[in-house]
Swiss-Prot record:
Protein name: Spermidine/putrescine import ATP-binding protein PotA
Role this protein plays: Part of the ABC transporter complex PotABCD involved in spermidine/putrescine import. Responsible for energy coupling to the transport system.
Listed EC numbers: 7.6.2.11
Matches recorded under Pfam families: ABC_tran, TOBE_2
Subunit architecture: The complex is composed of two ATP-binding proteins (PotA), two transmembrane proteins (PotB and PotC) and a solute-binding protein (PotD).
Location (main, coarse): membrane
Native source species: Mesomycoplasma hyopneumoniae (strain 7448) (Mycoplasma hyopneumoniae)
Catalytic activities: ATP + H2O + polyamine-[polyamine-binding protein]Side 1 = ADP + phosphate + polyamineSide 2 + [polyamine-binding protein]Side 1
Subcellular location: Cell membrane
Amino acid sequence: MKNIEKSEIIISLVDVDKEFGDKKVLDQINLDIKRGDFVTLLGPSGSGKTTILRLIGGFEWTTRGEIKFNGIDIKDVPAHKRDTATIFQDYALFPHLSVRGNIEFGLKLKRIKKKAEEIPDVVWKKFEHLKKKWQDKQKRKIKELKILQAHLEKLLENPQLDIKKRKKLQDKLDDSDFRYSNWENYLTSKSESFKKKYLTRKITKQEINKEITDIIDLVGLTGNENRAISELSGGMKQRVALARSLVIEPEIVLLDEPLSALDTKIRQKMQVFLKKIQQKLGLTFIFVTHDQDEALQLSDKIAIIRNGKIAQYDEPKQIYDYPVNKWVANFIGDSNFFQAKYIKKNQVEILGLKLYTIHDEFIPGQKLDCLIRPEDIDIDLDSGYFKGKVIQNIYKGSYYSLDIKVENTIINVETNDFYDLETQVFIKWDDDAIHLMEMENAEI
């Protein structure tokens, strides 16, 4: 497999819009993904997360905006020419082929670099000559398009344009943007075609056998090479799909809710397995799910998608502990929300009580949303911030989920201890358990 270093940004989405007819499904998506990261696109059904994945994979075209791969816009590059592999929810395996046959399928088109001594000098000279021609043509075409785009953008600044003319100009600008992307990729495309023809060779049968043996061992399918797909469990099918994607050595693996059809135990095992494989190979994984726990466990970073926009993009712990708003907090985990008032630096009022907080970035008197996670609340029988009584007790296997009524407020608490209904208790928390955020349209 490739030795891939985790460092620079490999994929960037810049001001990406996607429209289906009159419906805008993605709105100004900006997203940078580093090489070697496991990034999850998390959101409810219909939020646009799968559309983002399909745009990166080349299965959909952007309406406008850029999709940059290693700094070059590839939005007009077809799926089969992108250095990606996709694992679908239904696995998309070939039922008429065995495990080995499915994995071998992509390898048959693979090319191997020739050794330097196998390539005549005349071939290198020809390549350098053609490369100069391609570069000159690329520069000329890009310059022409820049002039055209500047002209169209100037025309669009006219506030007196009617809707019909504005749309016509915008369509021309969008079209020129796709042509710009095409010419940005012109040199790379021509160079790759030349290299494939003159600088590479077909993979041999012996090399195919070795690569298949190595990948089957990597994904834990040794001994199942000749089994039919219909004989496999869901977890094993997922491993075949993963092996088929990895064996072609893509830079990016796209995973569209690949674990959603598995039962809980197999799903948990596959989560661990996927993360282990990704870390071992150092590949970039872009993973779509609506399962919050799955995203938190697997990801280096999570992009939370809501109504076609990125609500928050950060490391899992940062999103869980410091959500940007109430919606994100509720979506990513269980929450207790209180209306709070910022008193002064490091002091906030919650349920009429002034408490210490680590927050110091707000304005005195500012109304805020206050988040406290259920697992951050402690129960004491003798003392605490607030006194209440247990009105609900649900056993969750590894903990108890309690609802505690404090005056007219219901507070959810997770605890390892059992408490009878109607038990009088006190609740409290550490200073850093208070997470403050601005209220939407809040007034000071």
